[in-house]
Amino acid sequence: MTMEINNTDPFEKMPLPDDSGLSGSGAFDDSKLAKLNGVISQGLNPYPYKFEKDEDICEILEKFEDFEKNEGLTVRTAGRLYNIRKHGKMIFADLGDQAGRVQVLVRKGNLPDEEFEIFKNLVDSGDIIGVQGDLFRTKRGENSISVSEFSLLSKSLCALPEKFHGLKDVETRYRKRYLDLIVNAEKREIFVMRSKLISEIRRFLTDREFLEFETPILQTVYGGANARPFTTFHNCLGQNLFLRIAPELYLKRLVVGGYEKVFEICKNFRNEDIDTTHNPEFTMIEVYEAYRDYNDMMDLTESLVSELVFKLTGSYEVQMGEKTINLRSPWKRISMEDALKEYAGLDIFAHSIEDLKKIAIENRIEDYEKAKSHGEFLALLFEGLVEDKLIDPTFIYDFPVENSPLAKNHREKAGFVERFELFLNGWELANGYSELNDPLEQEKRFEEQDKKRKLGDLEAQTVDYDFINALGYGLPPTGGMGLGIDRLTMILSGLESIKEVILFPQMKRED
């Protein structure tokens, strides 16, 4: 059978934005274009292939710590030029790479006259150059490199923001993150922190003999969380596919297959609202361990997060605005039912459903009309009345079964499941279960979810019969946990917007 391939250009019917001033030569500075032509007319390549960079700037700065020994030492490095200051026969500038900045001095007499004139007239702030020169200190004590050789490595054609005004517009920083990183060193540090965070998560788990796996991003059946998916179409297979909303069901298949400690650091995609703590494309880690339950997963989560915070910041305390949050163990653990009593003064089971509706209306809690049971009202009122009060790290455990289709029934409390969520700064940071491993119960839960979906609940889960079949071969008792890396980076950096910790957050097109 021959499958018809859809070769339609996906952009063919999409209105294209007005790119005037944003792309091509229209975005480039006229004076920089003229200088580019000047460089070429000198027979120089403004974009050479390679430069032997012997030292990072941070290593050069370390040499100044023993200046008596290293004065006059010849160094060779490269970076981007900032803040060029011309003083007749002397030109000062700052040279920066990913690790630091150092002042450079280009002096007539240290370079051939022709090269000095090229630097003076054709090199700009924003250009990337390589330099060789000797370490010295100015009369004002400024650590500097006296340049004896330079190479233009990349001629910039776009002007950097002014020194004193910088790049302040938040939306521009998000849309042009590359420019944000060029001019705002403190923003670069956020993503250095994020990179180290992910490395430390891997180290923590691999030290405990967990294995890292990769599971599909494109899936025929989406699941593992209650969320709306992104849909696409596979031309060759002739079928719809969904972008992953969670890796959970595939990772549990791996535990069925015999791997007892697994994790994945992954991108997930949820077609939902965008706000200060939600982005449709986000990063998380999911961890599963056989022969463990949700108590063990709380222990693992607490150890992981508290160790990460201390390793990356040198302290167990983080600052969120005016709030100081202490992540030193032990953390508070309280059931959802008791948390509602403690923080909102509400005993959920002492009220009728009609009473709970009135309470929801009085507190302007949305979607109360969807709640039909005490369990559903417990989850709804907890979210509306308690979550934002959980500033210090707090595990909320024992959730109602109605909104937890993948968690194991509670061993003692009917109507509840063994599930927890970690809250910090009023945000959900992690979610974990004693994993449901009864295939018949899982099928029943999925079918209940599917009924909700068909009645209009677009976040309800679908039935994954292959996953049910996998459970039929036997999933050992298993504990699982998912942790949001974006929000954890926000906590470590003291930031209140998720867009500040995602390099290229989703933004509405500028049509």
UniProtKB/Swiss-Prot annotation:
Could you tell me which PROSITE patterns the record lists for this protein?
Answer: AA_TRNA_LIGASE_II (PS50862)
Q: Where in the cell is it found?
A: Cytoplasm
Q: Which GO terms describe its molecular function?
A: ATP binding; lysine-tRNA ligase activity; magnesium ion binding; tRNA binding
Task: Give binding positions for Mg(2+) 1.
Answer: 421, 428
Q: What is its EC number?
A: 6.1.1.6
Q: How is the cofactor bound?
A: Binds 3 Mg(2+) ions per subunit.
Reactions catalysed, semicolon-separated, are:
tRNA(Lys) + L-lysine + ATP = L-lysyl-tRNA(Lys) + AMP + diphosphate
Tell me where on the tree of life, at the top rank, the source sits.
Answer: Archaea
GO BP term (any one): lysyl-tRNA aminoacylation
Which keywords label this protein? Answer: Aminoacyl-tRNA synthetase, ATP-binding, Cytoplasm, Ligase, Magnesium, Metal-binding, Nucleotide-binding, Protein biosynthesis
- What top-tier enzyme class does this entry carry? ligase
Major subcellular location class:
cytoplasm
A Pfam short name = tRNA-synt_2
Region of interest (Disordered), residue spans: 1-22
Asked if the Swiss-Prot or TrEMBL record annotates the protein with the keyword Ribosomal protein, the reply is no
Provide the assembly information: Homodimer.
- Protein name, as recorded: Lysine--tRNA ligase 2
Species of origin reads Methanosarcina mazei (strain ATCC BAA-159 / DSM 3647 / Goe1 / Go1 / JCM 11833 / OCM 88)
